[in-house]
């Protein structure tokens, strides 16, 4: 169960826009091994934990700490059971470091999803446009 304070989401977008272009330059696949995937289907893993993704690309440095302040103002509550059930994937263990707010992370193997993602407001305000990821 997660509770997000939506009035703080714009501040999180600003904080994210300061991090993404600094750590992502150009089109690449990401090592998501330490990032909670909320969608456990083997062929459609689309929803990843935003906090763990930012932590991973920054290696948990001072940029992450600054970003995390904005994140904590959005995610005011998050609790999960140790295991969850998916009709598609059965029982799975929750990553205890996950913080409950998911995001789509572009991948080179999903060009149509990436194109659709470019149309979202989050893409436009969170800094993805400044990473060079979508340039041909």
Task: Go through the PLM ranges and name each one.
Residues 1-136:
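Terminal, contiguous helix-loop blocks that mediate binding/assembly
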